[in-house]
Amino acid sequence: MNITGIITEYNPFHLGHELHLKSSKEITNCDGVICVMSGNFVQRGLPALTDKWTRTKMALEAGVDLVVELPTLFATSSAEFFAFGAVSLLNSLNVVNNICFGSECGDIDLIKKLSEIIINEPPLFKEYLKDYLKEGLPFPKARSEALMKYLDDNNYKIDFSYLEKVLNSSNNILAIEYCKSLYKLQSSIKPFTIQRLGADYNDEELSKNEIASASAIRKSIYTSNMEESLDFMPEYSYNLLKNTSFSDLDKMFDLVKYAIVSNPNVLKEIPEASEGIDNKIIQNIGKANSLDELINLCKSKRYSYTRLNRILCHVLLNVNKDLLSLRKSSPNYVRILGFNNKGREILKEIKKNSEINIVNKLSKAKADPLLEFDIKATNIYSFLNPSVKINSDYLISPIIFR
């Protein structure tokens, strides 16, 4: 079987996702699709709009054959760890031939070239990176500047204003990290990319005659009439959303506030909360009335909105240094969220070709700190979304789609 892997959040599943899935099947000419999907918390450092089982149903309705969960520790991390967790999981299955992801540039050769430079770290590139970091630039910006200078020195034929745009676009950044992970793992999986169409990844406004971003759809659902989002989602996705409940960001703020006020040292356990940002959060926690307000009071050139969101999410989930160290290795298990008949065949192939632990039922799973953390994350999510109960991970079986 020719199997394609895709890495998603489906938060929620919209027309852009439907196009990506269809195009991924066409461009790779595959026999089946495995989707690695974030669970109940996502890469922005927020609870998913709706739970992972509802989003699994959306994926299966759309034509994904097998949905597996990206462990929460990777799912709530920066692009580098998010990508490594997802790619290493797909690689460990030993059945995936291709990976297909969206990008703003749609240029797989450029993405691969940039990935090679970053992973190989030529001495001159390292020197430039060091210099830009000394200037106080945040790491992503310093790396972008170092890449541009290195390519310029090596007479790489490219418009540098275009390259700067490439290096500062959300999906391109993830695409580079996916390819970087493939190089790091010496994987035989072949990467493909599809140019992202429609609204920008971070665009929060719905616009007629355009594919909307998930951000805009979530904002519409949270702030106005849900029916506004109908034109931007497949009907099956909309109907599933209509019959479920959504996570409550105000409750998340209350829980984060409680965690920090009751134990200010909780921030010291999170390596990302360094350089005085922990003190800034503590100073502003009493002034803010919402998560958004707290982040806007604390953000700076070095600490972006999303980076702060992830730090606060890790406070909520009580992440510590020992847990974060697990991100350096591939997950030892694959958690099955749902499958169809073809997905059942793919599972048989995984069992034949891979030694990875396949988790269908948690009651039979081997002990694993990443899996235990997922269970805890779902239990915390149950305080934010009334459709999820404590211990839902034990109570809900993989979804079988016929």
From Swiss-Prot:
Q: What is the annotated localization of this protein?
A: Cytoplasm
What EC number(s) is this enzyme filed under? Answer: 6.3.4.-
One GO biological process term: tRNA modification
A GO CC term? Answer: cytoplasm
What this chain does, per the entry, is described as: Catalyzes the formation of N(4)-acetylcytidine (ac(4)C) at the wobble position of elongator tRNA(Met), using acetate and ATP as substrates. First activates an acetate ion to form acetyladenylate (Ac-AMP) and then transfers the acetyl group to tRNA to form ac(4)C34.
Name of the protein this chain belongs to: tRNA(Met) cytidine acetate ligase
Show the catalytic activity: cytidine(34) in elongator tRNA(Met) + acetate + ATP = N(4)-acetylcytidine(34) in elongator tRNA(Met) + AMP + diphosphate
UniProt keywords (A-Z) are: ATP-binding, Cytoplasm, Ligase, Nucleotide-binding, RNA-binding, tRNA processing, tRNA-binding
UniProt cross-references to InterPro entries, sorted A to Z: Rossmann-like_a/b/a_fold (IPR014729), tRNA(Met)_cyd_acetate_ligase (IPR008513)
**Which residues bind ATP per the record?**
7-20, 102, 171, 196
What broad class describes the main subcellular location of this protein?
Answer: cytoplasm
Gene from which this protein is expressed: tmcAL
Q: Which SUPFAM superfamilies match?
A: Nucleotidylyl transferase (SSF52374)
State the family it belongs to. Belongs to the TmcAL family.
* Keyword Transport attached: no
MF terms from GO for this chain are: ATP binding; ligase activity, forming carbon-nitrogen bonds; tRNA binding
- Class of this enzyme: ligase
